[in-house]
């Protein structure tokens, strides 16, 4: 009887530990990479943007610079430290995501919503992206599905509309003297 009790206790402990491994865990793609102004950015969101920028840069500059383009110096920071193409792309992705998240978070403040026409256009763009060779590579590498890509398109479109609303509200005019 004592042996049976020990085995049951052991089995219960093993089951409890096993279940704890599977509950409350997020996949790498769902994990929050960073938070900015109260807005979460997941690893997958950043990964999608980074891959798009990577493939665009490789298509544009790869023939000229080859694989060494990512370690090539493209500038210096305020401390005089060299900035590589790779670091520049990473920084651009982070800054772009920060801007999109903050602007999209203010959509209600400017009464910005997607129209039916915009939603239709986004759906068509997502379908085209998923069929495009670059889009296929991005989706495969990042494990993003069409829903994820659509979410990014929608958020980016909303951010753009908020930016337009801010500019319109500011009523900025530039004279010839400036």
Task: Please place each PLM-identified region on the residue numbering.
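Acidic/polar surface patches and capping/hinge elements
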Residues: 147-150, 161-178
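Bacterial N-terminal signal peptides that target proteins for export
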Residues: 2-11
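N-terminal targeting/tethering segments
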Residues: 27-151
